């Protein structure tokens, strides 16, 4: 991943403070004011050439894609797999006609898109994979099943996130409720699991309400971002973003207070505000951009794309 070093002059600092007053909904100069067709749920973002792409949960017409030339003004792009693939019903018989929570990454010269097939409230689920040489081509190869879960499992195979460790090895984190967040190493060629599942976060005393993992590596630490509590209830959503870190990709991950994330630990990064309710299902790009959805209280609770610049304090913890 590419890290961004910021050196802010006094003039830039003053400008930033002035700018912050023009953005009362976020209170931060780092807030990207997204407009246009910015409806999204469970976003994952990437930039190909001069075009930003954000992928999200689809509502019956394939995985949703929106694009932008500046990261602020968004328009719809063609969806992915608008016609259901035949193998989805094999593993998830009660699959509803939409796909959830995609994750887009670039690795070894190819774009990899992991996504979820499930039904609400069930852990009979599957994670699928699609790939392409160029997002702009609109041509995606179906790479099939990655991992599945059934009602007899204590985990839920949804909310995938690809991460590459400091040695260049790909891993997949995933999970939602049940016993929490899992991690497995991937084969560099097939981009599918090679063996063990590691448990890296859970909330045993909070109804299991942890999901949507995202891992990034920076300055000797792996940072695990997760979403706590409940999404999908519009302005009544209680979603919030929490995090911890570890010197090993397989954990243990600890929050700022030293609590293990396997025991419900997690320092809150974003719990929303008067306008933006239930922020979550976050994605971190290049250690410098924080993306998530939130429900707009000024627009009937519609789920929209939120983007902030992401910073790191003197102790190496994320902030925005």
Say what each PLM segment does.
Residues 15-16, 25-27:
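Cleavable N-terminal signal peptides
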Residues 8-9, 26:
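Short, intrinsically disordered, low-complexity terminal segments
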Residues 9-20:
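Bacterial N-terminal signal peptides
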Residues 27-320:
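Carbohydrate-active catalytic/glycan-binding domains of CAZyme proteins
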């Amino acid at each position: 991943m590419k890290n961004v070093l910021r050196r802010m002059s006094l003039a830039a600092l003053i400008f930033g403070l002035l700018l912050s007053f023009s953005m009362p909904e976020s209170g931060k100069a780092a807030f990207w004011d997204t407009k246009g067709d910015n409806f999204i749920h469970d976003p994952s973002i990437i930039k190909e050439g001069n075009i930003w792409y954000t992928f999200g949960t689809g509502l019956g017409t394939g995985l949703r894609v929106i694009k932008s030339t500046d990261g602020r003004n968004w328009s719809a792009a063609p969806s992915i797999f608008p016609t259901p693939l035949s193998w989805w019903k094999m593993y998830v018989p009660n699959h509803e006609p939409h796909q959830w929570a995609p994750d887009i990454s670039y690795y070894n010269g190819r774009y990899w898109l992991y996504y979820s097939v499930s039904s609400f409230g069930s852990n009979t689920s599957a994670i699928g994979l699609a790939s392409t040489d160029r997002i702009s081509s609109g041509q995606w190869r179906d790479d099939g099943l990655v991992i599945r879960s059934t009602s007899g499992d204590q985990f839920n195979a949804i909310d995938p996130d690809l991460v590459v460790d400091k040695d260049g090895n790909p891993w997949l984190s995933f999970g939602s409720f049940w016993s929490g967040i899992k991690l497995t190493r991937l084969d560099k060629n097939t981009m599918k699991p090679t063996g063990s599942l590691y448990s890296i976060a859970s909330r045993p005393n909070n109804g299991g309400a942890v999901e949507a993992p995202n891992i990034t590596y920076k300055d000797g630490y792996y940072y695990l971002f997760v979403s706590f509590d409940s999404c999908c209830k519009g302005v009544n959503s209680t979603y919030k973003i929490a995090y911890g870190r570890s010197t090993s990709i397989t954990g243990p991950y600890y929050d700022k207070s030293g609590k293990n994330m396997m025991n419900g630990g997690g320092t809150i990064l974003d719990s929303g505000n008067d306008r933006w309710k239930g922020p979550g299902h976050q994605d971190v790009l290049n250690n410098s951009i924080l993306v998530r959805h939130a429900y707009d209280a000024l627009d009937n609770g519609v789920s929209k794309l939120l983007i902030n610049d992401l910073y790191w304090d003197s102790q190496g913890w994320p902030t925005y």
